């Protein structure tokens, strides 16, 4: 049996939406829209508030150049296809292939953008241990500056606050992709 939160996560994923659970409420939002907002904080290399950091790159199931959506209706045998390539594409030349139900080309376009974005945000990740600050929460965006190829905006995917050995926050970050 599947839990309610798991069902909700699956529904959000299918719709290309993001889900955030806090102590008192569940928040569902369009990640692309939210990510377009200005970063709440900028961390500069050498900043005394950064206790430690780790930067990572993954090319496994990420760094796609475009996304091709193709769906054939089993009843009408009509095939709906759409390929999306963002203007800012710097991928590997790989095409992400998606076969999910869509009713028209507009739905295929929306799905292609969301699925490509979902995969490519996993390419660059970072984790920071910083001096404690209650304003750090999952879902907010921050910028890294002075970290060379990692200089960009990131979404906080997890913020673990700890009082052991002094107040610190462990931030898990994944890159924000703007424009799609």
Description of each model-found segment:
Residues 1-52:
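Short beta-strand-centered interaction patches in the first periplasmic/extracellular domains
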């Amino acid at each position: 049996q599947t839990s309610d939160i798991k069902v909700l996560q699956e529904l959000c994923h299918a719709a290309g939406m993001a889900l955030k659970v806090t102590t008192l409420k569940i928040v569902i939002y369009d990640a692309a829209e939210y990510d377009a907002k200005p970063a709440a904080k900028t961390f500069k290399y050498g900043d005394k508030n950064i206790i430690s950091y780790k930067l990572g790159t993954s090319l496994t199931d990420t760094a796609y150049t475009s996304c091709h959506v193709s769906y054939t209706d089993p009843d009408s045998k009509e095939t709906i296809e759409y390929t999306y390539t963002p203007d800012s594409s710097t991928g590997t030349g790989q095409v992400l292939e998606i076969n999910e139900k869509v009713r028209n080309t507009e739905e295929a376009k929306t799905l292609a953008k969301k699925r490509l974005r979902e995969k490519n945000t996993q390419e660059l990740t970072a984790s920071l241990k910083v001096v404690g600050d209650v304003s750090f929460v999952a879902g907010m965006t921050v910028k890294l500056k002075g970290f060379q190829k990692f200089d960009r905006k990131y979404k906080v995917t997890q913020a673990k606050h700890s009082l052991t050995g002094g107040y610190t926050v462990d931030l898990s970050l994944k890159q924000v992709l703007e424009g799609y």
